[in-house]
């Protein structure tokens, strides 16, 4: 399983429209990626590591694919349209991390 994470760094000047991201961008993304995208998750940063500190990332989006080749084929076919939507929800470029998921469980084993 491959996870593609988009990490939106937090700052005082950063703008992020979570409503637009969740209700317009992600559905558009899912439609374009089709069945290649197996799962999505969106997170909103609440706090940093120290009590009361701001989160390092204001928002994070995660996309899951069966393999790297599937992600590359699906994403690269629509990369221009997907990235052109960025100004509609944020004024910062996300940091992108592509990872191999090694453990993914629905509940902890005791």
What residue ranges belong to the model's regions?
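Macromolecular interaction modules
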Residues: 1-110
